């Protein structure tokens, strides 16, 4: 159990049979009446965001999440197969369970799978990945690093904006948190 006074961004709680992550909180002490905590909560299973108010000191169950290191081994039709790095058990996940980060998932990549009981809540990719550019407009003599950017498609099918000097076949480092180009590899 966790007190509403201990809420911080990132804390996970259980409400109404779901897991919620505290996005924002505000402790309010009105001049008259008792204090309360106004929160913005995000459902980690479906992404819904709600605002909810708790009395100061009210206790709610804290969600116990388990982080497991897994490796993406292969893709089987619309299922992605992951192997637990400790037990070597295989787990199948759909692209809906992985979310929008599926565009950076490459075979052999190690990820953290966040579980609530036996239910997969989230797949955490590394902060950056190195992928090969398979399609982009050719670079033209005179293009500079400060010039601008152009779209490029990487080996997983994701499209990101890269500097004009990047050409097909180069390996680039990409930030998976904000889809940005970090540099050549």
From Swiss-Prot:
Pathway: Protein biosynthesis; polypeptide chain elongation. Gene3D superfamilies: 2.30.30.30, Nucleic acid-binding proteins. PROSITE patterns: EFP (PS01275). InterPro entries: Elong-fact-P_C, NA-bd_OB-fold, Rib_uL2_dom2, Transl_elong_fac_P/YeiP, Transl_elong_KOW-like, Transl_elong_P/YeiP_cen, Transl_elong_P/YeiP_CS, Transl_elongation_fac_P. GO terms for cellular component: cytoplasm. Keywords: Cytoplasm, Elongation factor, Protein biosynthesis. It is found in: Cytoplasm. The keyword Protein biosynthesis applies. GO terms for molecular function: translation elongation factor activity. SMART domains: EFP, Elong-fact-P_C. One of its GO terms (biological process) is peptide biosynthetic process. Involved in peptide bond synthesis. Stimulates efficient translation and peptide-bond synthesis on native or reconstituted 70S ribosomes in vitro. Probably functions indirectly by altering the affinity of the ribosome for aminoacyl-tRNA, thus increasing their reactivity as acceptors for peptidyl transferase. Belongs to the elongation factor P family. This is Elongation factor P. The lineage of its organism: Bacteria, Bacillati, Cyanobacteriota, Cyanophyceae, Oscillatoriophycideae. The gene is efp.
